[in-house]
């Protein structure tokens, strides 16, 4: 079966690129901020944690008991992704500011209660890179399962979009992050998956 997950991700990159070309990034952020509501605020502020390293660690542990091979490929993909993203954030793009830095002084800016806003190290989005790395590895392992691929790609996109909703990243940041995470995970899967067929089994603690 065709790797539908990757095709959908490519299409979202295309749509994102068009948006970046034709929309002013600050005006776009202002509109997103204004269309929000308290219900979305609750969902977004919790869903965004799926891009945290802690969430990735929990997924990796769970994967060990499903398929060791998948867990190891995900671990390598996540580690490489996190390293590259942090290198880019703190070297080449260390002066890049987050949307909140520019919008916090707007008179009609809609603040989310009890949410911690950050202002620096905007590019690329670490949360987006992390969730796409993890989801891409899992989706690759289930290439024959269309439903699993669709669930994973929708989940990854939603988690990345929370960063825009929360004014923590511009659209370009989450696209770059998703690009890094997806490509690293995809090529790691292609290279490592056939080499670790002997690990295509769950971890059993009683063995």
Residue ranges and their predicted role:
Residues 5-9, 69-77, 148-152, 172-176:
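Alpha-helical transmembrane segments of integral membrane proteins
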Residues 29, 64, 85-93, 139, ...:
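Membrane-water interface at transmembrane helix exits
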Residues 48-67, 127-132:
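Hydrophobic alpha-helical transmembrane segments
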